[in-house]
Amino acid sequence: MLKMANLRLEFWDKDVEDKFIALKVEAYYDIIKELLFAHLYKNGYNCTNHLCLIAYLKEKIKDFDFEIQKVDELRKVRNEISYRGLTIKKDYFERNELEFKNIIQRLKEEANSIQ
């Protein structure tokens, strides 16, 4: 899971045309989701849905409340993109990209700290 998350991050860590912003937002959610699953599996847990991942985050990662809200918001945005064809404005992405990257970094650190 960590390898796939890193591969996705490497692929999407570049500027894209505005018409691809929704795909990049989806990709950030997928990267975060894969890192969460890696964390889950390393702790011996399994999860069957995205809400379970959010609940796991709340329980297991301390001092992460704002980030958890941002991940849940991203989950909802990703669902709107995937299931309703929502288009994403560039300013949404620009306002949130740094936070997405910070969440990814923290999740990588958390996953790597598990023995």
Tell where the protein language model's regions lie, with residue ranges.
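Terminal alpha-helical segments
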Residues: M1-Q115
